[in-house]
Swiss-Prot record:
Changing residue 708 to Q: Found in a patient with a variant form of Marfan syndrome; uncertain significance. The gene is COL1A2. This is Collagen alpha-2(I) chain. Belongs to the fibrillar collagen family. Changing residue 892 to D: In OI3 and OI4. The modification Allysine is found at residue 84. GO terms for molecular function: extracellular matrix structural constituent; extracellular matrix structural constituent conferring tensile strength; identical protein binding; metal ion binding; platelet-derived growth factor binding; protease binding; protein-macromolecule adaptor activity; SMAD binding. The lineage of its organism: Eukaryota, Metazoa, Chordata, Craniata, Vertebrata.
């Protein structure tokens, strides 16, 4: 909502702009053309603007200030025109004139209708005292006075016995009134009309805009191998190579800063090779380098020995579960149980902690070349290759079967208008119907289609002034105002009913990496993983023997998995790792229960103005108007200004069938016809112009779940929410995806240029060097940020029994849980140590029994515990620490395929696959409206890992392409850890001699190197083309299966595969345990201002303004003449009046008056707004909805209480109940008085509305009180004087079905102010009962149950006092 100051500023700006425009035209001169001939008389003009209101009726009560009235007519319009005007059409609307002086008093109007009753006047002055009248008869007993002050507290009574358990409370009251819902769905489609005569085919429409991209199709069948592409053009020559062959690889020097390039020197003579320089100091640890290309497969490692399998012990006998005993000594490890039945698919397991790098194995001897393996699974999808040459067009596909009916599309463009139908036969005359009610004046019909332009007529005389137009339809709702400041959090509502299980949420963004967990036990050797980035240099191993370099063999198939090794002992806790990259956001957690209301925080700053909201929905379509008679076509007048849109008219009667008309112009496009058969794909149409954004249609029916959308942009950081409940400890997450490739490091400084040595001949490839020395371990990085809880892992092997945790605090009583699915058969764990006895928790309500799980194998009998006192069922304790490793169980059956892991980082580009078969043409999409150009989206996240595709055939090697331009230098990377020294590569062929580089600075003299043997100088050869891949060798004999080898080095990560189809929705997880209550959150910010109140009645119309002369005067506008008449200068009277009116309306919103039109929320709000007011009856509206359900209450400003009276306030006196049976409590409203409990209605408000207001009243208060007076005759109400006990005391029923009694639990006992019903005297007495509580949900009283009634001489009646909330 615009602020008061904003509104005023905007209005003043608009007035200033208009004045500036008028003044800017002062100096312009208008050229006069020759006067035209006078034309024929024009048609009747369009309806004029709304006329002025009639004279006022008799004065009603003053209402709140309304908005400004309609503008007055522009003054002196006729006089502003002369014969030299440009045209006779109406000029633009004049500025609003200043408010004129009051007009002369009009003639008295006719007698008005009786106005509504005015509000009660102020009380008159007290009249003089009258003469004393005669003494009247004695009056009836007066109403009871206000309750006296409470007496002094009596002596403390004996503690009564523990009361019986109370009944469960009633369900909570309804929640807050919801905000107004969206417009309902469109109604059902009407019956189809009779088929019209087939019109001539319309002109073909323009090509529609391309439809939205369809959902991704299923993978097509494997395509045929395409023909090899043509050889590429020969690339241009490469740049000049470096001088001479590469020398031996020295150790890396420290990276220098890049120097500025020097001037190009002349080519110098080739110098002799200088001595090798000394090794530089050790460089800092660099970042992991970019993934290199896939190397040749390594030699297979030697197979490890299979460990011996331990013998399984006999299963123990299942002991009966004993009561919790004292904490015993840990028992011995039980024997492994028998193999369990195959379990259900577990959830993805937690991320294992990264194991330490193993020592590098010795290279094995080269094995014989194996036979070619069977075709492997299709590799992961590589990045998109370059576009291939266009293939020949495929044959047209078979026609697809019709798809399932789609959701209703958006309204299409209107079709071509058909020719008019032939005139139908006249129907029989209908029976005359009864006279209908007088209809309201019909609204002008919609503007008809524009006729053909007539020949221009002569300019006619000015037409008569048209009739006064009807008021226009209410405008569409304006744009949604900017969001106000954040409001204070409301009181905690009652929990609503449990909603249906929602659809699984989208995968969230990648969350932050969690803290490094404690180092887990080393897992069993896994299969060969993908090659990771180079790890830090390991500890220097002993020098291995150098094996002979074997010939590179074909990549062998992965060997069978080795048997699972025994679980190792838990390692020491590792150092904290460096901060990881932010991981994807975890899935959205379930909504926590709302926290309690916090204290009010400081008011935040006013937020910046939000963008305009989308246009509101279209209003309801009006009814069609009456068809008017066809008039004779007059000559075309000049185009008038568009009039205001009239209201829709009453539907006309059915006309006679007309003659077939001439063929009309091409009409507006019609609605979409029924869905046709899919046509062939049309040629793409030209891009349409960006259309205006259409108005939002009504919400359609919910569509089926769409395909997974791309991740949205990361939103701005929202305000910190209140602290949630502490979740249970999450299971360890799955291993994180491989990080993205790091940025390229900065180029090192140029090294010292040595003198150029003679070009040596290319030497043979040297053997691999020994591994370098291990680097020292780096310092631990700072602790990482706390990660989001990982996804639930797959079910791990049963762990050993953990140490018993400390007893948990008693949790609150849990709600009744949903019936859980049948659990898996768990593996047999070790007998746990007996935990300490926890304090008894509240007993939760019993949930429905789950299906019995399959019997687990018997566990080992635990030690006999001491018999503990049986405690109430406690909630689950906190999760214990991880116990010692259990004995390895027998190998289970292989589980089903697990859920796909998170997507890996983008791998190196794969080879270009063969093109797939052309798909069949899809159905033509419906025309979409052209959208506005959106901003470029951010890079999407990597897609899900797809299923492995079929391998494509290897394409022929293309010729080398031209070298690309140099890319820009990337930003400087952080210093990475020093990588291991790679094996020496083979010496490449020497390049051509390059030009002589600039002289470097003088290097430090190195130690003298040993003289090398001088080789013969060879000629530098040209770089040869890549050879074709050789054919696979002949398959050898299938060798015996070797023992499983040790884990080889991780292979390179393959490219990401195509996205697989979305998996099925997972099952609903088990409900989590109820967490402990969170800390009370801080009080929220003040809420936004409420919606504006209804506008007041329009003010009287302004008097005729001075107006401006907008006709041409020959030289300049009349408004720009010297300002002799001050009345022509527009003042901002109207602006001031509007601003005052707005100010008053805002003022009434902020300070409620306690009237029916402007009620307060509670009496406390009234007292704060008007501290000078006195107690009395005022109107309040606790639910703050429409003021029609406001209630009239008594406000006690001395205490700030809001008091609501019962209706009726008393139950009449009589012998209500006759019974000779045993005495018992009988409810007055429920049993005796035919089910009518006490009611608290207010005039003009229904009982349901009153119940809602009472519910809000209870939520807004934190204290309530009420009293009730029991009038008795021979009936005990509280204490029986004969026996001295309270067994005959009445019972009261509170609002939440709680029973308030005379003795027992102090929270549910009432107090007695006066007890006059303690003995039977055959006379009337009374007992006044009062109940005060800080739980307002227990009041007001709804019923009373006396015990001592039923005799012929026993009577009673009840006065119900008001219930007061504070």
């Amino acid at each position: 909502m615009l602020s008061f100051v904003d509104t005023r500023t905007l209005l003043l700006l608009a007035v200033t702009l208009c004045l500036a425009t008028c003044q800017s035209l002062q100096e312009e001169t208008v050229r006069k053309g020759p006067a035209g001939d006078r034309g024929p008389r024009g048609e009747r003009g369009p309806p004029g603007p709304p006329g002025r209101d009639g004279e006022d009726g008799p004065t009603g009560p003053p209402g709140p200030p309304g908005p400004p009235g309609p503008p007055g007519l522009g003054g002196n319009f006729a006089a502003q025109y002369d014969g030299k005007g440009v045209g006779l059409g109406p000029g633009p609307m004049g500025l609003m004139g200043p408010r004129g002086p009051p007009g002369a008093a009009g003639a008295p109007g006719p007698q008005g209708f009786q106005g509504p009753a005015g509000e009660p006047g102020e009380p008159g002055q007290t009249g003089p005292a009258g003469a004393r009248g005669p003494a009247g008869p004695p009056g009836k007993a007066g109403e009871d006075g206000h309750p006296g002050k409470p007496g002094r507290p009596g002596e403390r009574g004996v503690v009564g016995p523990q009361g019986a358990r109370g009944f469960p409370g009633t369900p909570g009251l309804p929640g807050f009134k919801g905000i107004r819902g969206h417009n309902g769905l469109d109604g059902l489609k009407g019956q189809p009309g009779a088929p019209g005569v087939k019109g001539e085919p319309g002109a073909p429409g323009e090509n529609g805009t391309p439809g939205q991209t369809g959902a991704r199709g299923l993978p097509g069948e494997r395509g045929r191998v395409g023909a090899p592409g043509p050889a590429g053009a020969r690339g241009s020559d490469g740049s000049v190579g470096p001088v001479g062959p590469a020398g031996p690889i020295g150790s890396a020097g420290p990276p220098g800063f890049p120097g500025a390039p020097g001037p190009k020197g002349e080519i110098g003579a080739v110098g002799n090779a200088g001595p090798a320089g000394p090794a530089g100091p050790r460089g800092e640890v660099g970042l992991p380098g970019l993934s290199g290309p896939v190397g040749p497969p390594g030699n297979p490692g030697a197979n490890g020995l299979t460990g011996a399998k331990g013998a399984a012990g006999l299963p123990g006998v299942a002991g009966a579960p004993g009561l919790p005993g004292p904490r015993g000594i840990p028992g011995p490890v039980g024997a492994a149980g028998a193999t369990g039945a195959r379990g259900l698919v577990g959830e993805p397991g937690p991320a294992g902690s990264k194991g330490e790098s193993g020592n590098k194995g010795e290279p094995g001897s080269a094995g014989p070349q194996g036979p070619p393996g069977p075709s492997g699974e299709e590799g992961k999808r590589g990045p998109n290759g370059e576009a291939g040459s266009a293939g020949p067009p495929g044959p047209p596909g078979l026609r697809g079967s019709p798809g399932s009916r789609g959701l209703p599309g958006a309204d299409g463009r209107a079709g071509v208008m058909g020719p008019p139908g032939s005139r139908g036969a006249s129907g029989p005359a209908g029976v005359r119907g009864p006279n209908g009610d007088a209809g309201r004046p019909g609204e002008p019909g919609l503007m008809g289609p524009r006729g053909l332009p007539g020949s221009p007529g002569n300019i006619g005389p000015a037409g008569k002034e048209g009739p006064v137009g009807l008021p226009g339809i209410d405008g569409r709702p304006g744009p949604i105002g900017p969001a106000g400041a954040r409001g204070e959090p409301g009181n905690i509502g009652f929990p609503g009913p449990k909603g249906p299980t929602g659809d699984p949420g989208k995968n969230g963004d990648k969350g932050h990496a969690g803290l490094a967990g404690a180092r887990g036990a080393p897992g069993p050797d896994g299969n060969n993983g993908a090659q990771g980035p180079p790890g830090p240099q390991g500890v220097q191993g002993g020098k291995g023997e150098q094996g002979p370099p074997g010939p590179p063999g074909f990549q062998g198939l992965p060997g069978p998995s080795g048997p699972a090794g025994e679980v190792g002992k838990p390692g020491e806790r590792g150092l904290h790792g460096e901060f990881g990259l932010p991981g994807p956001a975890g899935p959205r957690g379930e909504r926590g229960p709302p926290g309690e209301s916090g204290a009010a925080g400081p008011t935040g700053p006013i937020g910046s103005r939000g963008p305009s909201g989308p246009p509101g929905p279209d209003g309801n379509k009006g009814e069609p108007g009456v068809v008017g008679a066809v008039g004779t076509a007059g000559p075309s007048g000049p185009s008038g200004l568009p009039g205001e849109r009239g209201a829709a008219g009453i539907p006309g009667g059915k006309g006679e069938k007309g003659e077939p008309g001439l063929r009309g112009e091409i009409g507006n496009p019609g609605r979409d016809g029924a869905r046709g058969a899919p046509g062939a794909v049309g040629a793409p149409g030209p891009a349409g112009a960006t259309g205006d954004r259409g108005e939002a249609g009504a919400a359609g029916p919910a569509g089926p779940a769409g395909p997974r959308g791309s991740p949205g942009e990361r939103g701005e950081v929202g305000p910190a929410g209140p602290n949630g409940f502490a979740g249970p400890a999450g299971a360890a997450g799955q291993p994180g995806a491989k990080g993205e490739r790091g940025a390229k490091g900065p180029k090192g400084e140029n090294g010292v240029v040595g003198p150029t040595g003679p070009v040596g001949a290319a030497g043979p490839a040297g053997p691999n060097g020994p591994p370098g020395p291990a680097g020292s371990r780096g310092d631990g990085g700072p602790p990482g940020m706390t990660g989001f809880p990982g996804a639930a892992g797959r079910t791990g092997p049963p762990g050993p029994s953990g140490i018993s945790g400390p007893p948990g605090p008693p949790g609150p009583a849990g709600k009744e849980g949903l019936r859980g699915p049948r659990g898996d058969q768990g593996p047999v764990g070790r007998t746990g140590e007996v935990g300490a006895v926890g304090p008894p928790g509240f007993a939760g309500e019993k949930g429905p029994s789950g299906e019995a799980g399959t019997a687990g194998p018997p566990g080992t009998p635990g030690p006999q515990g001491l018999l503990g006192a049986p405690g109430i069922l406690g909630l689950p304790g906190s999760r214990g620490e991880r116990g010692l490793p259990g004995v390895a169980g027998a190998v289970g059956e292989p589980g089903p395929l697990g859920i796909a892991g998170p997507p890996g980082a983008r791998g190196p580009p794969g080879a270009v696959g063969s093109p797939g078969v052309n798909g069949a043409p899809g159905e033509a999409g419906r025309d979409g409206n052209p959208g506005n150009d959106g901003p470029p989206g951010r890079d999407g996240q990597p897609g899900h890992k797809g299923e492995r595709g079929y391998p494509g055939n290897i394409g022929p090697v293309g010729a080398a392409g031209a070298p690309g331009p140099h890319g820009p230098v990337g930003p400087a990377g952080k210093h990475g850890n020093r990588g291991e020294t790679g094996p020496s590569g083979p010496v490449g062929p020497a390049g051509a001699v390059g030009p002589r580089g600039p002289s470097g600075p003088q290097g430090i003299r190195g130690d003298k190197g040993e003289p090398g043997e001088k080789g013969p100088r060879g000629l530098p050869g040209l770089k040869g083309h890549n050879g074709l891949q050789g054919l696979p060798g002949i398959a050898g004999h299938h060798g015996d299966q070797g023992a499983p080898g040790s884990v080889g080095p991780a292979g390179p990560r393959g490219p990401a595969g195509p996205s697989g189809p979305a998996g099925k929705d997972g099952r609903t997880g088990h409900p989590g345990t109820v967490g402990p209550a969170g800390i009370r959150g801080p009080q929220g910010h003040q809420g936004p201002a409420g919606p504006p109140g209804p506008p007041g009645p329009p003010g009287p119309p302004g008097v005729s303004g001075g107006g401006y002369d907008f006709g041409y005067d020959g030289d300049f506008y009349r408004a720009d003449q010297p300002r002799s008449a001050p009345s022509l200068r527009p003042k901002d009277y109207e602006v001031d009046a509007t601003l005052k009116s707005l100010n008053n309306q805002i003022e009434t919103l902020l300070t409620p008056e306690g009237s029916r039109k402007n009620p307060a929320r509670t009496c406390r709000d009234l007292r704060l707004s008007h501290p000078e007011w006195s107690s009395g009856y005022y109107w309040i509206d606790p639910n703050q909805g429409c003021t029609m359900d406001a209630i009239k209450v008594y406000c006690d400003f001395s205490t700030g209480e809001t008091c609501i009276r019962a209706q009726p306030e008393n139950i009449p006196a009589k012998n209500w109940y006759r019974s000779s049976k045993d005495k018992k409590h009988v409810w007055l409203g429920e049993t005796i008085n035919a089910g009518s409990q006490f009611e608290y209605n207010v005039e003009g408000v229904t009982s349901k509305e009153m119940a809602t207001q009472l519910a809000f009243m209870r939520l807004l208060a934190n204290y309530a009180s009420q009293n009730i007076t029991y009038h008795c005759k021979n009936s005990i109400a509280y204490m029986d004087e004969e026996t001295g006990n309270l067994k005959k005391a009445v019972i009261l029923q509170g609002s939440n079905d709680v029973e308030l009694v005379a003795e027992g639990n102090s929270r549910f006992t009432y107090t007695v102010l006066v007890d006059g019903c303690s003995k039977k005297t055959n006379e009337w007495g009374k007992t006044i009962i009062e109940y005060k509580t800080n739980k307002p949900s227990r009041l007001p009283f709804l019923d009373i149950a006396p015990l001592d009634i039923g005799g012929a001489d026993q009577e009673f009646f009840v006065d119900i006092g008001p219930v007061c909330f504070k």
